[in-house]
């Protein structure tokens, strides 16, 4: 009888029971088994008599099906039994080895249905840990594919190769095919040929891992075939067949002995236990055995196919039916919903029969694709709507009553209207399930409308600034040129006052506070401040250009000359002057020159009346990279300062003064010439009068020889002095004499000599002062 | 015995044989069968004794397996036989109906292996066309899932529902389960319960189409169970069981009669033939039955899983191992190849065991993903390389010897070098299989390098134009202002000549032909022409601004005045004039005024010496939309013409002439005043001399009372006339008297009177001419 009841090595939850080691120890007691043990397992369809066979053959006590009740699964998991008693034809009472028998749960049970996971792992485990694997099959199963577990064996062979194919222990397994209910009509040789051929075919078709490509079935397995008679209808023969089978498990040395050394794992028993547990772990972790059921695999394949077809039909219908409706929200949405519903319905009709989770997963994916496709049209519609609403807004803003409605108000109203209509359209799409996420669209729309409003605002601002510029620039130019062409000492104070007031006047409509402006565009305080600053920059640039273009050397000389002549030619009341004496001319010259040069300094350096250099309060220069903006060189090689206040260089100042002096000297010369011609011109009738009045005196002189002699002597002396240019010494002598005796000479002589002397001194003094000024 | 041999209705290639109609006619001859016929088919695993049963039961002659040879498939396709002879327990020799029997190819044959396509279609067809479907199964198959064709039945039930579920003919099928080799240990009731429960479970799990959700198994099928004893080991009982089965096919009216009216299709025989053919077409076309084999489905699932894992591992390793190598082509490529090979090897090891085409397909997809991921790094590398090479090119271009190497040459050399290194790098990647298509990268690279060269070219061009501008603008300004400040009648000819020559001088380095320039940047002829045109536009704008800013009213008045004074104040030799008479002044005045006004016309309208208006040869104005560029309104409301040649308006011309006249009149007045003072001034010593010389005459007059009396009378008369302003009439009288007696008066008197008269006339004439000119 059996030693002990069988234990469950691996339960239905695929847990390895470590009590096996304890069981082994109970079975073998204190005996040293060493390597003298064997492991046998069984594999086959459910209720194919596996347990019955093992019990009859090895006197084990595995549960078997009670056929009188019904056909159903009995063995669950993998059970382990120990035996030393094998049913044989003759009783051999010698030292029998310990045999450990694994009864494996039957494959293809209707209880597990499509879930083949445990079957594969159990079969794999049986092959891995056994020396002999009994493959149990009904005679009638031979020739079937699924029914004879050939598909299962193929998978098991493949995984076995990848997991254990390269093992170094040259472990081989005996596959013992036991053919049940073999009635004998078909010879066993024919059946074994069929099975062998099938196995070899499977092996050829296997996907073998690297290094096992050339391997053969027989590198890993030996095949044996045994037939057993019908247990119920041929009971005696069945018993006899089983005993004959039993002989091959105990008859060492004989040809048919099954436990050949090459099948043994060569592990001590406790080593085998660890090995078995390790095998189960590896098998459990192997993902190649983690396959979805046939149902799920088919469902994935079919739902994918159906989904693609439905989408294809949707797309083919889409364009032609949507094209004419692109502008109409109502008909567009209804058509979109219709097309989408049709597509999903078509999918549902065909795909709903497949596994629900797979069907729903693919439906979600299809829904996403449909929405993605639809979103293109929705985006187009929303963009068209946006364009239309935007045109409305632009028209409304441009045609508003500018007196009663501000730009900001009309833009805000238009924006509000756009947002309302846009959101309504989007809600329509969303309510109908055509739009999933509207955050992205809303965000893009908001960015778009902000961008467009910014453009509109920029255009309005540009127009306003353009108008300001169009007035400000010429006005500034005119005012500055007018002030500079008639300058005073405080011309720059005037220019600055006018500069500020001109700016103020041109943007007075936008002033909110002192130095705070709102350009009525809806900009922030800082943006308005920046625009104000830009306007000031423009104004300063205009001032700079105007000043530096106007105040050239020629212009400044002209200004100085005008100023000089105003004072020199006209008296305080504005009447033209008539010169009587040179002293008048010299005095007027000095005053006029001083009056002109008063403004020369302000025309060459822009300073206020407090002698403070004028510096722009905003940056004017465009930053030219790598260039010093303080100094630049013109095309004549002259270096200039770019500072606003610096109008003339020292060299240019010299140039101006030279030209000015030259011109006013000419004026003075003209004036002095007018005196000379006034002074020495004696009308012709005077000579007549003198002749008439002096006739009697003249006659008296002629009659008197003394007078004649004196006249001749004086004439001759006069002639000689003049001829030989001796007036200088004569003048000196006369002057000396005059200096000594002038107090006694009459007013006439003194007056005559002094007047001539003043003219000469004036000329010399002018030359001398000119040299003196140059030296300074 | 059997009437005729069976025919093949549907062959192994799934072709429907239309000879069936002919066969029917042969079987029934000229008899009118009407609806008195029945159709039976059989379904079950291969070699399960289906054909044997049909032959025994209906005396047909279907081929059966010869068990003594080997177990293998015999029936291929679907065969049709006709019988009227049913094997029954008692011989009933009455009018038997015609029975058409379909022998269907067995399912799960190892010959077809995993290909279940025909099995499904055959089973579906059998259900569709039969009244009774015999489901043949071994007793031992009960409890198995695949082994008992339950999976197959499930698929068939599903497709049957979708294809024929909504048929209006209320067609029902009797499923007659014949359990073979029923040894009787398990009661038939138990077996039928097991099968029924299994079928009901399958039906519940079915995915039913719309409209069939609430349907029951029994809406479409009736179930019957029959057990047959072991044919070989219980031969007599088997025969008896078959006869009992046969009774149920012929015993009308009995409870167990199988051919109930609700199973009949109610079609005449030829109608049934068309129906059968139509059914087969529908079944053939149904895609739900077109499933890949389990092998392929598993392969798809597993290779996807393996591929994703391999890719995941590749990506996790990728970043940290690539990051330090991004700059080195050699080590980068070797590491990329290594990582890619590792990934593909890992995939190959696990996935190569699965169906080859699926494995290769997924491998290609994985390869594409790997390359896509790698291409990111390659793009980064190539972009970095591009940046580095580009910096080299920029350095080389900027530091070239500008005397010996042109911009175009150095750019071309640099570009060639970049392309060479870039292509070498790309070839390296391509040769190692890391890059599939390099057209896109090459195209993007070419676009990039063209864009960068364009930027470099633009910068170089901008620099060149900047230098041209920096010289051209001030030079033009100076020249124009110089010419305009000292204008001649042909000033505009001079300005135009100088304008063209200044432009020419500044771009002479780039001239190729007359009016053709190459700016040595590598631009096309049209691009060079455009740049030349832009330079001319700039020059014209400068000319326009300079002219219109300079030629203001004040400046033109100043120019005219200078020109007047040059002629009026200085004689032909350049000496200052000293006026002797008013006639001289008037003559000089006329000449000088005419000389000044010569240039007034050219200063207000820019025309050449041929009196042709100067029009710019390039468009200067920036097009301000919606604005007429011919006329603009300044800030004083005055309308201006924007045409270049129009310098002064009519109003401004009047203004200039007024100011000019006022100024030159002052000058003339000064000059005339200088004459007056010259004419009438008598030095004081003359009076002394006159007194001295005329003392004796004076005394003589005093002593003579007549002279005294005359003197008093003349003095009194003189006083009265002066007091009452009667010089006019006195002058008239004197003139009249002189006119009558002047021939007798001495030169002195005539000279005195005439000179005084000329001065007065000069004054009156000036006023009169002034009024006259104003009226003109
Ligand atoms: N026809 C037949 N039935 C058998 C044979 N061996 C066992 N059975 C019966 O088949 C049923 C199932 O046997 P069992 O050993 O539990 O099958 P297991 O599920 O493969 O272990 C039991 O009712 C046995 O009596 C046999 O060789 N031939
Ligand atoms: N054990 C057994 N064998 C049978 C039975 N009926 C037929 N066979 C044998 O099974 C083999 C196959 O029979 P066949 O009718 O060709 O099977 P089919 O492929 O289903 O048509 C033949 O050798 C028959 O002799 C039966 O009821 N029991
Ligand atoms: Mg069992
Ligand atoms: Mg057959």
UniProtKB/Swiss-Prot annotation, chains A, B:
EC number, as in UniProt: 3.6.5.-
Entry binding sites for GTP: 44-51
GO biological processes: endoplasmic reticulum inheritance; endoplasmic reticulum membrane fusion; endoplasmic reticulum organization; membrane organization
InterPro entries cross-referenced by the UniProt entry: G_GB1_RHD3_dom, P-loop_NTPase, RHD3/Sey1, Sey1/RHD3-like_3HB
Listed transmembrane segments: 682-702, 706-726
UniProt keyword terms in alphabetical order: Endoplasmic reticulum, GTP-binding, Hydrolase, Membrane, Nucleotide-binding, Stress response, Transmembrane, Transmembrane helix
Membrane topology value: Multi-pass membrane protein
GO terms, molecular function: GTP binding; GTPase activity
Induction: By salt stress.
Keyword GTP-binding: yes
Signal peptide coordinates: none
Main location: endoplasmic reticulum
Additional remark text: Present with 2265 molecules/cell in log phase SD medium.
PANTHER family for this protein: PROTEIN SEY1
Subunit structure of this chain's protein: Interacts with RTN1 and YOP1; GTP binding is not required for these interactions.
HAMAP family the UniProt entry points to: Sey1 (MF_03109)
Stated name of the protein: Protein SEY1
Species this protein is from: Saccharomyces cerevisiae (strain ATCC 204508 / S288c)
Gene from which this protein is expressed: SEY1
């Amino acid at each position: 009888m059996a030693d002990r009841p069988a234990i469950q090595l691996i339960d239905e939850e695929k847990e390895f029971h470590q009590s096996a080691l304890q069981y082994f120890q109970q079975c073998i007691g204190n005996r040293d088994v060493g390597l003298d043990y064997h492991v046998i397992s069984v594999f086959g369809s459910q209720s194919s008599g596996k347990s019955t066979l093992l019990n009859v053959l090895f006197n084990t006590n595995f549960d078997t099906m009670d056929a009188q009740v019904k056909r159903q699964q009995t063995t669950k998991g993998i059970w382990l039994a120990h035996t030393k008693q094998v049913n044989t034809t003759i009783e051999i009472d010698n030292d029998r080895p310990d045999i450990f028998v694994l009864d494996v749960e039957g494959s293809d049970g209707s209880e597990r249905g499509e879930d083949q996971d445990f079957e594969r792992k159990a079969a794999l485990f049986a092959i891995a840990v056994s020396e002999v694997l009994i493959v149990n099959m009904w005679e009638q199963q031979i020739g079937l594919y699924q029914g004879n577990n050939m598909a299962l064996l193929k998978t098991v062979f493949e995984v076995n190769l990848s997991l254990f194919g390269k093992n170094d222990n040259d472990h081989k397994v005996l596959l013992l095919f036991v053919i049940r209910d073999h009635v004998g009509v078909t010879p066993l040789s024919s059946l074994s040929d069929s099975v062998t051929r099938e196995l070899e075919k499977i092996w050829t078709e296997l996907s073998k891992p690297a290094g096992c490509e050339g391997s053969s079935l027989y590198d890993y397995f030996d095949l044996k075939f045994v037939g057993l008679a019908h247990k119920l209808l041929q009971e005696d023969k069945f018993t006899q067949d089983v005993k004959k089978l039993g002989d091959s498990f105990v008859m060492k040395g004989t040809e048919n002995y099954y436990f050949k050394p090459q099948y043994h794992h060569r592990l001590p028993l406790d080593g085998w236990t660890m090995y078995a547990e390790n095998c189960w772990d590896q098998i459990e972790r192997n993902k190649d055995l983690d396959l979805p059921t046939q149902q799920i695999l088919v469902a994935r394949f079919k739902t994918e196919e159906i989904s693609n077809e439905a989408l294809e039909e949707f797309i083919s219908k889409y364009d032609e039916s949507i094209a004419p409706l692109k502008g109409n929200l109502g008909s567009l949405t209804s058509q979109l919903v219709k097309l989408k519903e049709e597509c999903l319905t078509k999918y549902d009709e065909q795909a709903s029969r497949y596994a629900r989770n797979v069907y729903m997963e693919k439906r979600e994916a299809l829904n996403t694709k449909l929405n993605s496709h639809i979103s293109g049209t929705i985006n187009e519609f929303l963009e068209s709507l946006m364009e239309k609403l935007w045109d409305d807004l632009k028209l409304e803003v441009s045609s508003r009553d500018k007196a009663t409605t501000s730009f900001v108000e009309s833009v805000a109203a238009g924006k509000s209207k756009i947002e309302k209509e846009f959101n309504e359209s989007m809600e329509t799409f969303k309510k109908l399930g055509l739009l999933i996420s509207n955050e992205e669209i809303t965000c893009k729309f908001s960015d778009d409308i902000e961008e467009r409003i910014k453009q509109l605002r920029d255009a309005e601002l540009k127009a306003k600034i353009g108008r300001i510029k169009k007035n400000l620039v010429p006005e500034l130019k005119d005012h500055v040129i007018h002030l500079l062409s008639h300058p005073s000492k405080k011309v720059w104070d005037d220019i600055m006052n006018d500069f500020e007031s001109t700016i103020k006047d041109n943007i007075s409509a936008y002033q909110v506070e002192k130095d705070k402006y709102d350009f009525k565009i809806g900009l922030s305080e800082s943006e308005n401040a920046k625009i104000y600053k830009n306007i000031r920059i423009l104004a300063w640039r205009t001032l700079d250009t105007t000043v530096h273009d106007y105040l050239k050397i020629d212009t400044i000389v002209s200004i100085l000359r005008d100023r000089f002549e105003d004072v020199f030619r006209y008296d305080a009341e504005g009447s033209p002057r008539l010169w009587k004496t040179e002293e008048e001319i010299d005095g007027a010259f000095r005053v006029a020159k001083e009056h002109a040069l008063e403004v020369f300094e302000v025309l060459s350096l822009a300073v206020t009346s407090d002698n403070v250099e004028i510096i722009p309060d905003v940056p004017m220069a465009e930053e030219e990279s790598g260039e010093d903006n303080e100094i630049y060189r013109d095309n004549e090689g002259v270096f200039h300062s770019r500072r606003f206040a610096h109008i003339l260089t020292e060299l240019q100042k010299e140039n101006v003064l030279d030209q000015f002096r030259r011109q006013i000297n000419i004026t003075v010369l003209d004036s002095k010439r007018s005196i000379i011609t006034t002074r020495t011109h004696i009308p012709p009738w005077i000579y007549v009068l003198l002749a008439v009045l002096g006739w009697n005196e003249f006659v008296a002189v002629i009659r008197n020889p003394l007078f004649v002699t004196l006249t001749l002597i004086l004439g001759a002396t006069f002639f000689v002095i003049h001829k030989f240019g001796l007036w200088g010494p004569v003048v000196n002598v006369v002057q000396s004499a005059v200096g000594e005796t002038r107090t006694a000479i009459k007013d006439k002589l003194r007056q005559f000599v002094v007047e001539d002397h003043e003219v000469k001194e004036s000329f010399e003094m002018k030359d001398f002062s000119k040299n003196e000024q140059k030296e300074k």
